Amino acid sequence: MEFSCTLTLKELLESGAHFGHQTSRWNPRMKPFIFEEKNGLYIIDLAKTLAQLKKAVACIQTTIGQEKSILFVGTKKQAKQIIREAAIECGEFFASERWLGGMLTNMATIRNSVKTLNRIELDLEASNSGLTKKELALLAKRHRKLLNNLEGVRHMNSLPGLLIVIDPGYERIAVAEAGKLGIPVMALVDTNCDPTPINHVIPCNDDSMKSIRLIVNVLKDAVIDAKKRLGVEILSPVRPAERPAEEAVEELPLPTGEAQDEASSKEGVLLWADIDNCEALK
């Protein structure tokens, strides 16, 4: 039995997934996914979000069935910890700190950086390296920087079969690299983004941690389910000894004057009756 997306419109609404950006900051190409304009904000059609999410789940299961890997990409503050945790749990690769140019189009350079990281670790572990305390401290600092940037792709030895991106506008370099190589892109897309380069659009609020977490968890569960059904072992892309010290990430307030404000957020519950009519707008 295949994985079934059980997410509901009510859950999406409660997470704030319906809040788009101010009407002055929209991308007209997102019009098919917009339900209405309210108080200067565009409201995303959550019925279409749910429909697109179900298609995304099917795409993920196909990718896993073809024995291809997935690369989760989300480097902005609201997404990075969610992306990292989800990728580790489902055993896929991730880029959560920064996108290194050429991560896909120039993998040889990235692999060389990984080799450098491995050499530094050997030097730090060696008791007879002959390095001074100052040199060891500088080496440790360089190690932390490399590990932060390469942690999620350290063991990615071939191109992924799918990119899952949070905010393709913010991650435009990653999307462009995937496009050049013909790698399909699945993305959480807000009303200010261009959906054209995206193969699988999931329209939603990509600025709210609650919204991001809710949707990413569905995608993560789809990966786990597909692997279990196929008998594929779930291996974390990060080995325990490789993990850097984790930083706490606080829930961010909704950005005022940019995406949505608290006043509009509180009105969200009033939109529940309207959501019942979303199907009529398809």
From Swiss-Prot:
Tagged with keyword Transmembrane: no
Entry-linked Gene3D superfamilies: Glucose-6-phosphate isomerase like protein, domain 1, Helix hairpin bin
Coiled coil: none
Top-level taxonomic group: Bacteria
An individual GO BP term: translation
Record-level Gene Ontology MF annotations: structural constituent of ribosome
Keywords, alphabetical: Ribonucleoprotein, Ribosomal protein
GO cellular component, one term: cytosolic small ribosomal subunit
Region entry Disordered, spans: 245-266
The family this protein is said to belong to: Belongs to the universal ribosomal protein uS2 family.
NCBIfam families to which the protein is assigned, alphabetical: rpsB_bact
Name the UniProt record assigns to this protein: Small ribosomal subunit protein uS2
Organism: Chlamydia trachomatis serovar D (strain ATCC VR-885 / DSM 19411 / UW-3/Cx)
